[in-house]
């Protein structure tokens, strides 16, 4: 298995990670970005950028992200796409190495680094989980269709939730899934008419587009009861429909013991219910760094975590200010702090003449 040695390993290739890489590479620090999927993430799926200084609003988030990545690469950043990080060691006691004290593991290679940056962002779902939701998280349960949708090509999936996010994610899944069961526990027509959503026009356009998709089955006024599965992962979801059904074919068997309960045969469950929001992606951290009560990584003013030489930037910190410009700022601060840390400087160096 290949071993990559570097000064700075960055997990995540969003605006925070790319900005950090730009600065560390300009400081002549060997930098590697490990990116799970370059076309996912909050910025990548944004259709237009209207609030990033100096960027024309006709530019998409993905275009801006590619420019950030290319700029970092111009200064020497090594970019690894489709990187599935599943574990990390963050102290010299764990790595048994006095120089490369951080190790990141993927199925295809190992990265040894002198410093580590966590920039994996967040995905939407906080609040009380449904039975089986946490058990099958990462094994069929997901909060990010744009991250995991391609894994469910020609499969049956369920999307639960009546929010704008649920509608957009369900639309994305129609590109891959055989059938998308869209489950809402409310009357959608009443919800949109009442103006509960902030962007009524956009929501109704997306809603109409979703309902016109041939592979979408909408089950409204339907409750999600449980996610079920086996050792292989999710095999279905148990739902409860109103008398007469919820407006679509169930695709499963009715449970005679409990009238109105139906088991839908699905391989993926994308949940955007009550409490949908931002959940930092920290599953690979294995409790090796301190998190706050909401799951965000705790950092100091230099973006350093509870472990020396490990930094966290962007939405993984779970701040209220989830903006591209804020994520980029985090990346800049972390990079300058890393340069100071690795070179044992007393003061932060403002900029560098790149060699």
Model-predicted segments: where are they?
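A Rossmann-like FAD-binding core segment of flavoenzymes
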Residues: 69-105, 111, 177-301, 340-355
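Glycine-rich dinucleotide-binding loop and its adjacent helix/turn
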Residues: 122-171, 176
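Hydrophobic beta-strand scaffold positions of dinucleotide-using enzymes
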Residues: 10, 117, 270-272
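A conserved FAD-binding loop/helix module that cradles the flavin
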Residues: 169, 316-355
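FAD-site-proximal beta/loop scaffold in flavoenzymes
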Residues: 129, 134-151, 246-250, 272-322, ...
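Phosphate-coordination loops involved in phosphoryl transfer and adenosine-cofactor binding
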Residues: 5-7, 82, 153-155, 221, ...
């Amino acid at each position: 298995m290949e071993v990559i040695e570097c000064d700075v390993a960055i997990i995540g290739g969003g605006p925070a990670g790319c900005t950090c890489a730009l600065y560390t590479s300009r400081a002549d620090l060997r930098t590697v970005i490990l990116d799970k999927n370059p076309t996912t993430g909050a910025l990548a799926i944004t259709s237009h950028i209207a609030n990033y200084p100096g960027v024309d609003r006709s530019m998409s988030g993905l275009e801006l992200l590619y420019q950030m990545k290319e700029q970092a690469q111009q200064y020497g950043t090594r970019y690894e796409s489709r990187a599935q990080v599943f574990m990390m060691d963050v102290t010299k006691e764990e790595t048994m190495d006095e120089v490369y004290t951080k190790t990141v593991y993927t199925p295809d290679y190992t990265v040894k680094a002198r410093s580590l940056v966590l920039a994996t962002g967040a995905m939407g779902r906080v609040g009380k989980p449904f039975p089986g939701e946490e058990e099958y998280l990462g094994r069929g349960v997901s909060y990010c269709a744009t991250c995991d949708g391609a894994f469910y090509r020609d499969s049956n999936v369920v999307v639960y939730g009546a929010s704008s996010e649920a509608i957009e994610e369900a639309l994305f899944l129609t590109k891959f899934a055989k059938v998308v069961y869209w489950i809402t526990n409310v009357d959608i027509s009443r919800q949109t008419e009442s103006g509960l959503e902030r962007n009524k026009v956009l929501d109704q356009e997306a809603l109409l587009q979703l309902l016109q998709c041939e592979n979408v089955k909408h089950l409204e006024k339907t409750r999600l009861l449980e996610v079920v599965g086996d050792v292989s992962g999710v095999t279905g979801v148990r739902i409860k429909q109103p008398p007469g059904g919820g407006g679509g074919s169930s695709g499963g068997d009715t449970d005679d013991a409990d009238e109105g309960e139906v088991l839908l045969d699905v391989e993926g469950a994308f949940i955007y219910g009550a409490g949908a929001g931002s959940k930092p992606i920290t599953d690979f951290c294995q409790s090796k760094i301190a998190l706050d009560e909401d799951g965000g990584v705790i950092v100091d003013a230099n973006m350093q975590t509870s472990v020396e030489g490990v930094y966290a930037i962007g939405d993984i910190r779970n701040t209220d200010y989830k903006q591209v410009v804020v994520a980029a700022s985090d990346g800049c601060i972390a990079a300058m702090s890393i340069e100071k840390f690795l070179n044992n400087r007393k003061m932060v160096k403002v900029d560098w003449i790149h060699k």
